[in-house]
């Protein structure tokens, strides 16, 4: 397993495990932010963030591994990270627009929702990207 494929496999497994721990650690940290209003909504948002961390900790290495099996460069790695960030960002935007339309603008509550639902999965993907960036060598520079 000393070859480049072995390093990539170990990098994918390590990225998944470390990103899972980082994401759940952030969820535990954000739980300490006070919740104003209905605590059921706060608990549901925290559960969404925690489940998103679990999903992205598993799905991320699969997507990164598939992408890097096709093109092993850092641009492809960045593209895969952007693709992985689209669903949590879209979910947050949809929920924030719906909340603002029906209940009004509540900055503190919406900021907490951002912290609980988007930050943990985004941190999970970021940790995976940074670990795999160490495994994938930079592109060789072209000299004239």
Q: What positions do the PLM features span?
A:
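Membrane-interfacial segments
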Residues: 30-34, 70-75, 97-102, 135-140
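Alpha-helical membrane-associated segments of multi-pass integral membrane proteins
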Residues: 7-16, 91-96, 101-139
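C-terminal TM-helix exit segments that contain a strictly Trp-centered aromatic cap at the helix terminus
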Residues: 19-31, 53-54, 86-101, 117
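Alpha-helical transmembrane segments and their helix-start/interface "positive-inside/aromatic belt" motifs
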Residues: 2-14, 71-80
């Amino acid at each position: 397993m000393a070859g480049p494929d072995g390093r990539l496999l170990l990098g994918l497994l390590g990225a998944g495990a470390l990103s899972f721990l980082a994401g759940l650690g952030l969820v535990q940290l954000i739980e300490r932010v006070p919740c104003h209003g209905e605590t059921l909504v706060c608990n549901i948002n925290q559960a969404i963030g925690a489940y998103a961390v679990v999903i992205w900790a598993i799905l991320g290495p699969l997507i990164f591994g598939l992408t890097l099996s096709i093109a092993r460069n850092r641009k492809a790695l960045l593209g895969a990270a952007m693709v992985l960030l689209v669903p949590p960002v879209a979910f947050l935007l949809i929920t924030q627009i719906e909340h603002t339309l029906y209940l009004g603008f509540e900055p503190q509550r919406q900021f907490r929702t951002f912290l609980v639902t988007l930050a943990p999965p985004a941190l999970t993907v970021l940790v995976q990207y940074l670990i795999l960036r160490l495994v994938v060598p930079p592109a060789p520079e072209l000299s004239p």
